Amino acid sequence: NQRLLPYHEELKKAGACFGVSGEYERPMWYALNNEKPEYEYSFDYQNWYSSVEFETKNTITNVGLYELSPFSKYEIKGEIAHSELQRICTANIKNEVGRSTYTQMLNEAGGIEADLTVICIGENYFRIISSSATRTHDKAHIIKHISPDLEFKDITDDLICLGIFGPKSRNLISK
């Protein structure tokens, strides 16, 4: 009963070995050199170690593309969206289109309730991305702590999410 990504077949052809995260079947690693993209469990060296090592080294030295679509995604809109996010987030949230801010939301005792990224889509219009594992919790926490005057929408299943990481990521994005 897992959900498939819109480009599932392309990932499969690229050698993806799939696992489940947040209701989605998503790539966990990619097989190298025509190996089978399947887990071979062992108490010894795992068959996927070389693939993950390759991906990690490439990302650290170059650029890596990661499938993050199961991550939770929300939109908040309204006249006071920026001020509400400023109030409930630990970082300074910029109300500037295109700006993204990594931040947390705390509880009354100062403990971390949510670990997320806030992106300004338009004036007083924000997208929030958080972990797939904490979707229900984060959604409830945000709704509980923002004004009911704001428009809140869970858009997790509406959008894909790709992460581009590494020292050459800005060069790739600028092309």
Regions found by a protein language model. Name each.
Residues 1-175:
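Glycine/proline-enriched, intrinsically flexible loops and inter-domain linkers
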